[in-house]
């Protein structure tokens, strides 16, 4: 790793402060269940009506209005990811990112928020037009210590603090290990670090923004309790496109690595635009602080949500209708459900213009 821009101390975030909840009453706010945009209908020349569905049938569906560019991308604007209910769009002509809360079910319809980030800086021999994903270190980019991380396809990883409007700028890192070129960045609240799983899931890279370090911490994973697969299962796995997803349960403090195995539906190349992928297998590993990744078919009351958003976990018992011990998956052309107990997969083909799961949001009255 190499830090290629001058150090900006404003980027570093403080160590988290622990707050003890009152013993006399619950401090947990009422929250929406996880949700996603099920469909959209044009509403005038510049907006669409979003049909938002929740992961539990016991919560009423919602209709929201949003700018058309958030669901119908063009050469000028592309949505590139989501974190904590904030969607990021890349404005190609000016080379800047903008954060929107339009897809957040509790955000204002009449007064949506827009946060413009500083102009992107492209490092030598890097690119900033294709983005793997974005991650926020806290619930809102308006919070003073919130850091936005952007992982670009290839070498570059960039950070900034949106709340520092007067002197906000990007803090750019160049990654040389090719196993991280297509990785997705996530923020670990437990470790107070941004983390990247390497391709194949053998290596984890972590950046501690509380310390002035120009190099990340690396951790090699050791796999345990691997399942015995038949020859046919191994051949299927080897023929799949594999992706790794790091997800943290904030309620239990556990960390999981999820491996997805997907195949093209009609045998076309992944390089062909619009290629349909179908989930053929899922493997979940519980990862400890020592780098042990233990295969598991039991995550208890938890449900994991994977999409083009930053992955997240919820306690299923907190949201009646959400299935425990499941992985929910949402992609551009598929929604699927994986049951860890028996490794069964239910998959549906559908076109999603905004394939983002939104995590639970606090409901304010």
Describe each region flagged by the PLM.
Residues 16-18, 36, 47, 67, ...:
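Detector for intrinsically disordered, low-structure N-terminal pre-sequences
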Residues 18-20, 38, 69, 248, ...:
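N-terminal non-cleavable signal-anchor helices
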Residues 18-34, 43-44, 135-145, 244-252, ...:
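Short, surface-exposed loop and linker segments with low hydrophobicity and enrichment for Pro/Ser/Thr
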Residues 2-84, 89-96, 103-105:
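A non-catalytic, helix-rich entry segment at domain boundaries
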Residues 38-40, 91, 101, 259, ...:
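Pocket-edge structural micro-motifs
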Residues 3-6, 46-64, 69-73, 270-365:
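C-terminal closing repeat unit and adjoining cap/tail of repeat-based domains
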Residues 36, 147, 184, 245, ...:
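Generic structural signal for residues positioned in beta-strands
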Residues 74-76, 80-267:
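A sequence/structural signal of beta-propeller blade repeats
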């Amino acid at each position: 790793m190499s830090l290629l821009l001058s150090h900006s101390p404003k980027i570093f975030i403080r160590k988290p402060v622990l707050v003890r909840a009152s013993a006399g009453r619950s401090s947990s706010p009422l929250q929406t269940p996880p949700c996603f945009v099920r469909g959209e209908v044009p509403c005038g020349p510049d907006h669409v009506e979003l049909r938002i569905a929740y992961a539990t049938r016991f919560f009423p569906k919602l209709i929201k209005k949003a700018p058309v560019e958030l669901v119908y991308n063009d050469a000028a604007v592309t949505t590139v990811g989501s974190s904590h209910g904030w969607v990021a769009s890349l404005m190609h002509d000016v080379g800047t990112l903008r954060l929107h809360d339009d897809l957040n079910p509790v955000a204002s319809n009449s007064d949506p928020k827009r946060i413009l980030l500083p102009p992107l800086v492209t490092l030598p021999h890097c690119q900033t037009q294709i983005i793997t994903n974005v991650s926020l270190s806290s619930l809102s980019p308006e919070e003073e210590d919130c850091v936005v991380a952007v992982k670009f396809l290839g070498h570059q990883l960039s950070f900034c603090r949106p709340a520092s409007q007067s002197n906000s700028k990007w803090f750019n890192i160049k990654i040389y290990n090719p196993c991280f070129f297509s990785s997705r960045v996530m923020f670990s609240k437990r470790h107070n670090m941004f983390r990247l799983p390497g391709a194949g899931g053998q290596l984890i890279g972590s950046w501690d923004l509380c310390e002035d370090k120009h190099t990340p911490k690396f951790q090699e994973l050791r796999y345990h309790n691997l399942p015995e697969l038949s020859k046919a299962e191994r051949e299927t796995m080897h023929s799949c496109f594999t992706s790794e997803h790091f997800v943290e349960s904030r309620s239990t403090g556990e960390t999981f690595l999820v491996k997805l195995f997907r195949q093209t539906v009609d045998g076309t190349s992944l390089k062909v635009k619009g290629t349909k992928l179908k989930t053929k297998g899922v493997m979940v590993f519980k990862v400890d602080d020592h780098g042990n990744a233990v295969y598991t078919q039991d995550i208890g009351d938890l449900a994991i949500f994977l999409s083009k958003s930053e992955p997240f976990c919820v306690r299923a018992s907190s949201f009646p209708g959400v299935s425990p011990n499941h992985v929910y998956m949402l992609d551009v052309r598929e929604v699927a459900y994986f049951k860890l107990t028996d490794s069964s997969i239910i998959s549906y083909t559908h076109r999603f213009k905004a394939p983002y799961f939104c995590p639970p949001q606090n409901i304010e009255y």
